[in-house]
């Protein structure tokens, strides 16, 4: 019994304008032709072609002694390219049948040499010089000497100059050194956004340690899990942080940056000396959601953050030299905060966004305008609140908006692309690759995409065998280069699973993102979702396994 596909589609409920499927392979046995078909006197059928309404269809006719292959490809897919790929695949197949008839089809390399070179090397020619031998706090100290009286941090009515911030951080760093903090020593940071947070963060780096963000608003179970895994030598806290940690039995020693300030207020205001500290030591350990129910700590080194700073400077800030005021908007536990505070290394001013207004579009816009914030960094969810509240009087600020942490839908992309008075960038990157790995300016010429790799970053779209996927073909996105983290703290097996040797660069490492993507013909990447059950909420990665384990 046979039924036409039109009937099948009608019964399926799929709208008539939507293809029932987008590609069709039809293999059929056809008896060898013995004579031209006779239709009527004086008419002879020489040849014929079937037509389908599907974007891609391939018909294989088996004539016993030979085959006929006919491909029909709609124009927007690229008929010439599809036929070239088919020709190469058939060529490789015939060679394999002769040389290795027992081999697997998946081992065939169907990528043309020129295209292979493009996706592996051409679109990854991102090498740039940067300060490979400097630690973050050293670059900050160099900036202090250049702009000592410039505003470093503004928080409400309080403004702290570069000199004052440096002196405060140095005194606290001397105290931390006295508590045994040195290279790769982990120090908790349980503070809200503000002057104290930046003082504590810089002090930890100056003492040689790595900061471990602890959001005071986290559930006690999550705080306990992070503390048990990271085992910080000491925790720097404000009142809210201390309250959250005091509720936990067996918490590490706590230094309250308000109540305990007398312990270090008389210590030297010059940087402490830390022997053996290099850019390959840890700058921070940030915890992300874990599929087993336990959060996992991502270890990031100074050198990776220094490269992020330089890459963003090249990709964004040099294009907008007047953008001097940068929002300090993210939670301390969100790695997006890193690309915000590193702007201190360039002499910019960090403006703290008050917590009560962060998710009130109208009040947030008022704060951005009042504080003259030039660069705002947020998730699409937060941006939707801002744009929904924006009126004609709100056109000036911010000049530049960095949007990341979640995928941008087509509607928002089109809306942002239509704005001429402000510039929007879509940034993409997992915590394991130091915040941002790719970047795209949002313009009307393109549909939503995540752009290409930043300076000293490599991006590959690979199949299950770690072979590069052709342009336009979906695969898993792998990230290599200067941003790849050291690995997961206390998780050697997971580190080996997710951080692998780079098969294309000797001595390199790749991070398996779990994100699905494909290359576009212009060298940009299109994000296609996940290959697992991870989701993002307001920019935070959530493993459903962690929720199930509660």
Please tell me what each predicted stretch does.
Residues 174, 220, 234-275, 305, ...:
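AMP-dependent adenylate-forming
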Residues 296-325, 335-374:
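Conserved AMP-binding/adenylation subdomain of ANL enzymes
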Residues 1-84, 91-99, 109-110, 122-126, ...:
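Adenylate-forming
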Residues 191-202, 217-221, 329-346, 358-363, ...:
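Conserved coil-to-alpha-helix start sites within the AMP-binding
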Residues 1, 25, 58, 83, ...:
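Generic structural signal for small/hydrophobic residues in well-ordered secondary structure
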Residues 285-298, 431:
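Conserved adenylation A10 loop of the ANL superfamily
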Residues 341, 345-348, 373-377, 387-449, ...:
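Gly/Ser/Thr-rich phosphate-binding loop
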Residues 47-68, 84, 88-91, 99-286, ...:
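AMP-binding/adenylate-forming domain of the ANL superfamily
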């Amino acid at each position: 019994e046979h039924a036409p596909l039109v009937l099948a589609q009608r019964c399926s409920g799929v709208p008539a304008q939507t293809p029932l499927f987008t590609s069709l392979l039809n293999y059929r046995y056809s008896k060898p032709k013995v004579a031209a078909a006779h239709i009527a006197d004086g008419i002879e059928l020489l040849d014929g072609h079937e037509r389908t309404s599907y974007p891609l269809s391939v018909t294989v006719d088996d004539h016993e002694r030979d085959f006929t292959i006919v491909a029909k490809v709609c124009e927007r897919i690229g008929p010439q390219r599809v036929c070239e790929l088919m020709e190469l695949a058939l060529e490789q197949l015939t060679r394999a049948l002769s040389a290795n008839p027992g081999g697997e089809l998946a081992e065939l390399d169907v990528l043309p040499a020129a295209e292979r070179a493009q996706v592996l090397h051409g679109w990854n020619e991102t090498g740039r010089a940067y300060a490979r031998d400097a630690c973050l706090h050293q670059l900050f100290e160099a900036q202090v000497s250049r702009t000592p009286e410039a505003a470093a941090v503004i928080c409400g009515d309080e403004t702290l100059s570069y000199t004052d911030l440096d002196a405060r951080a140095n005194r606290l760093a001397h105290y931390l050194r006295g508590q045994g903090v040195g290279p790769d020593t982990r120090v908790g940071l349980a503070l809200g956004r503000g002057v104290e947070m930046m003082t504590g963060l810089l002090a930890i780096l100056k003492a040689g340690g790595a900061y471990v963000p602890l959001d005071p608003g986290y559930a006690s179970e999550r705080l306990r899990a992070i503390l048990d895994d990271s085992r910080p030598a000491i925790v720097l806290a404000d009142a809210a942080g201390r309250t959250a940690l005091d509720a936990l039995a067996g918490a590490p020693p706590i230094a309250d940056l308000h109540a305990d300030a007398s312990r270090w207020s008389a210590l030297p205001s010059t940087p402490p000396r830390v022997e053996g500290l290099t850019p390959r030591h840890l700058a921070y350990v940030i915890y992300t959601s874990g599929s087993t129910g336990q959060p996992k700590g991502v270890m990031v080194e100074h050198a990776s953050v220094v490269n992020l700073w330089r890459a963003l400077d090249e990709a964004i800030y040099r294009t907008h030299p007047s953008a001097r005021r940068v929002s300090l908007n993210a939670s301390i536990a969100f790695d997006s905060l890193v690309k915000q505070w590193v702007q201190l290394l360039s002499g910019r001013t960090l403006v703290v966004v008050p917590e009560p207004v962060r998710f009130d579009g109208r009040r947030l816009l008022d704060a951005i305008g009042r504080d003259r914030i030039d660069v705002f960094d947020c998730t699409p969810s937060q941006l939707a609140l801002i744009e929904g509240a924006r009126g004609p009087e709100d056109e000036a600020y911010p000049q530049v908006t960095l949007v990341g942490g979640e995928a941008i839908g087509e509607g928002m992309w089109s809306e942002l692309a239509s704005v001429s008075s402000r510039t929007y960038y879509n940034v993409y990157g997992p915590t394991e690759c130091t915040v941002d790995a790719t970047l795209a300016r949002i313009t009307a010429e393109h549909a939503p995409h995540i752009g290409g790799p930043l300076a000293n970053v490599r991006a590959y779209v690979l199949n299950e065998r770690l072979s590069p996927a052709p342009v336009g073909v979906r695969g898993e996105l792998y990230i290599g280069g200067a941003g790849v983290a050291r690995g997961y703290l206390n998780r050697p097996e997971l580190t080996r699973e997710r951080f692998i040797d780079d098969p294309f660069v000797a001595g390199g490492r790749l991070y398996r993102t779990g994100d699905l993507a494909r290359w576009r013909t212009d060298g940009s990447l299109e994000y296609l979702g996940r290959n697992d059950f991870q989701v993002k909420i307001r920019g935070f990665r959530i493993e459903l396994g962690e929720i199930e384990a509660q």
